[in-house]
Amino acid sequence: MGFEVLFLALALPTAISLLLKRSNIRRLLLTAVVFAFEGRYLAWRLGTFPWGNEQNGAEWFWWLLVLAIELVVIIEVTLFLFTISWLTDRTGLADQAERKLRERYASAGKSAIPSVDLLITTYNEGPEVLENSILGASEIDYPAFTVWVLDDGKRPWLKHFCEDAGVRYITRPNNQGAKAGNINHALKQTKGDLVMLMDADFVAYKNSMWRTAGLFENKRIGTVQTPQNFFNPDAIQHNLGISLSWCDEQSFFFRLIARGRDALGVAFCCGSCSIHRREALISNNGFPTDSITEDILLTVNFCRLGWKTIYLAEPISTGLAAETLDSFFIQRKRWGRGGIQVA
């Protein structure tokens, strides 16, 4: 009888959740169902443990090892479901902020809206990548912005191309601090109210600044992160031939996990496709250089300084995903190493 009662207790909210239109409520109810199943399984599992029975050391070791593995899996699933149980959608807020920003511009000109410096960081990317990024950035629809190409490769051809394209070019005598050092060097030579970051293989959308700049009307916001959207399949999708039936790995993070973290108030900067308040960057002495994942460490520092990071689940650019397994795993290794450094 107990099983039937449990089944009905779980089936009812599941059926109701499938009928509800609000996805967050549906997701919360389904999460509650999974939590109930996890709790029931854990109670049963602990009941199978040979408490009080005489077992030799080897038997106890294997019992405890399997139980520990199961507990780790249950905790991991619980934390994941908790993270995605409620998702934010700031599209309406961005619409409202853009409308107010355009009204201010229409009534008082570009002095009434925040100026933006778009920084494109590059080291060894070729012209077939950089030309699209630079030309796309120069065509952004916003009255008060400047495009800066930060070249740590010190390439004369790139300097000439920037001059022809009408964008600014910056290099430096050394590459100290890698990407973070490159950005910090540029911050000293620029003066926009906001700083937008794009990797060399990302092309910004025409309306990218209108969609994000108005969100900084909230004086507590230090960073607005947007999705990293890709136009090509990553190396895994390409090699398995599943690009038409399976989304890229990053989409899972930016469509679900990032929105869930934002709802919990723990969104973080992912580097490219983010826009920052200059005042906030200055309060932190720029990007931290003591981690190879300077973006995540910046978020931690911003929290300590009282600045807020939010996530707008709306692509403002399109980029190039890792095309080979070597580059794919090198990138993930760097992220993992940086995460350990921050922790």
Feature roles, as predicted:
Residues 290, 299-318:
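Catalytic donor-sugar/metal-binding loop of nucleotide-sugar-dependent glycosyltransferases
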Residues 117-125, 140, 215:
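A conserved hydrophobic helix/loop-capping motif in glycosyltransferases and polysaccharide synthases
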Residues 134-144:
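Short, acidic, metal-binding catalytic loop of nucleotide-sugar glycosyltransferases
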Residues 83, 87, 170-194, 206-292, ...:
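Long helical/loop segments within the catalytic core of UDP-sugar-dependent glycosyltransferases
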Residues 151-158, 174-175:
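A conserved acidic beta->alpha catalytic loop
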Residues 1-110, 162:
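N-terminal membrane-anchoring/stem segments of glycan-assembly enzymes
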Residues 114-117, 146, 282, 297:
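Cell-envelope/extracellular polymer assembly enzymes that use nucleotide-activated donors
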